[in-house]
Amino acid sequence: MKWLCSVGVAVSLALQPALAEDLFGNHPLTPEARDAFVTELLKKMTVDEKIGQLRLISVGPDNPKEAIREMIKDGQVGAIFNTVTRQDIRKMQDQVMDLSRLKIPLFFAYDVVHGQRTVFPISLGLASSFNLDAVKTVGRVSAYEAADDGLNMTWAPMVDVSRDPRWGRGSEGFGEDTYLTSTMGKTMVEAMQGKSPADRYSVMTSVKHFAAYGAVEGGKEYNTVDMSPQRLFSDYMPPYKAGLDAGSGAVMVALNSLNGTPATSDSWLLKDVLRDQWGFKGITVSDHGAIKELIKHGTASDPEDAVRVALKSGINMSMSDEYYSKYLPGLVKSGKVTMAELDDATRHVLNVKYDMGLFNDPYSHLGPKDSDPADTNAESRLHRKEARDVARESLVLLKNRLDTLPLKKSGTIAVVGPLADSKRDVMGSWSAAGVADQSVTVLTGIKSAVGENAKVVYAKGANVTNDKDIVTFLNQYEEAVKVDPRTPKEMIDEAVNAAKQSDVVVAVVGEAQGMAHEASSRTDITIPQSQRDLIAALKATGKPLVLVLMNGRPLALVKEDQQADAILETWFAGTEGGNAIADVLFGDYNPSGKLPMSFPRSVGQIPVYYSHLNTGRPYNADKPNKYTSRYFDEANGPLYPFGYGLSYTTFKVSDVKMSAPTLKRDGKVTASVEVTNTGKREGATVIQMYVQDVTASMSRPVKQLRGFEKVTLKPGETKTISFPIDVDALKFWNQQMKYDAEPGKFNVFIGVDSARVNKGEFELL
């Protein structure tokens, strides 16, 4: 792959603007050398220069490039985000080198969440792969392309555990499970940062949003979070720590309050936990405008007080507001903020710049000027093969009645739906520098797959939504939803006519990407009514109906599950989404994705997640009882459980075999199963291992994921899959907030999803 190739570009500092002779050189990238270097640099800096390093400025209408260059010249800026071309980045770094007193380099950051120019599946889709090699591919390609654009840092990965699909930002994360999110977040950090964020094609990561942003009440964006310390540390904190233990150089602090205190002013969170308990040495960055928002939170009385509270609480860099530059000089002069506190924040910023290699070469991610691409969006800069490979693994087959799929590449195929030919929507939210015109739609992918062997007829069929208020909301800043001026009846009639002349109907339905984004919380997680009407009309034709879902959250699909012959969950699959979806629809690739979030039957079930507590009156479907934990108007469990996903073949999992009946605290026990492909074609599935602490000092979840492995088998082939279990897999935060495992019986569940499992057991001595 080209992103693995060594380019061998050595940038001579002699070719760049004049540098401070004692600042730049071949500095060893070690903590000891860094600390000594930064200590000496701090001695040379004025108060204003120190404060300038704490400012993270966004390029945009409020801060045009020309105005920012003046700030840079005066040493008022430490870093820039939302500039994504080498040419623009080079000009800004030139300003530092040419005009600023100390020539301390800027770093440049962007939201590279699931790709930079090549857009991969959204993170929720990537989690569906249950494949860490796929995560590594996304991380390395994303870092390569970001660094090739001159960027030094990404605001990723997002590791907020979310169990509420009403929340729009769940699309950015890895789902409901702590273990899966931790594992994927850790892998993404390692892939993006490589051996060092100073490497030419690596970038520094910023784990976000610290902390528990995915648990906002009611799934409502920016809302409050309130939970016990046991739940916080058991379920929500581990993914952040996993990313930091993997070496992430930065943490983005959440916008929400946690147990009554905004994260931006929470010294317990940012100092006691992050710095003292976890030993984090990197930078903390406020989220967009969060310091200003402390006033509305009610924990600061005015702008000056907000700055004082934020800095003293542990916020190093201020994102996209002018408060630090306006109010810190006076606070330092008055002694309300000490010089030691200012130096500490500045030191953290200088440390990460050192770790990025910027004091060795401020242009390290830019290369020589004559190497800048003539066309920033050139096709040659994309990594389409990798995008297609990963996208195929992210797709989840939810239903396949009477083997409706795979389709034949013959006859007539109707492709309908408002998302079938949407280049923008297939990329999903937070698509970085991706260009919509370079993405492949489902319609294009199907046409390419069948060539001249089949006839494809297309009809839009419906708008994403006919609710004018929702359209206005979604289109407030960009045209996220395009509205067809035809009447709903005209559009449905066209789709029905297309269906009647076809052998099978593929309806591409769900959400516009803007509906699963920041500030896109929903109270109704069904498919919009305009599309439900379309589906009903298509069902009435009697033709086989395949639903291809595009969405950034679990949807309530009870009616659609009854109507459709097959359902394929594709999330937002990225640049090569259309081709990947066609690969699965026609059987060129056997689907193997699994759900990283449970799909509720209705919004009233939320939160519904697999690792719940048993309660004192658990519901037993085999022996229903009124006085148990249940709903009387809806089934208890989800429509599709966590870890669920079908294949075009079938698998049999044997009984669980334990290597020993007991486990010593310093030992291991192994749980094994034999997995057989009992179908007629090669396929892959994800074998999942869950653990349950049967009796403990606190009520424990009915099961918790503690291992998974994707296995590919030929027809009739059998493989043994083994999972080692040690005491760390059994630990939890008890009532005294001690992290420990308690002796006693443990159940082990292994299967192809969280519901279909076989059981083993052992005892911890």
Locate the predicted segments by residue.
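Short glycine/proline-enriched turn or capping motifs at secondary-structure junctions
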Residues: W3, A755-N758
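Gram-negative bacterial Sec-dependent N-terminal signal peptides
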Residues: M1-L19
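Glycoside hydrolase catalytic-domain context in secreted enzymes
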Residues: A20-N734, D740-S754, E761, L765
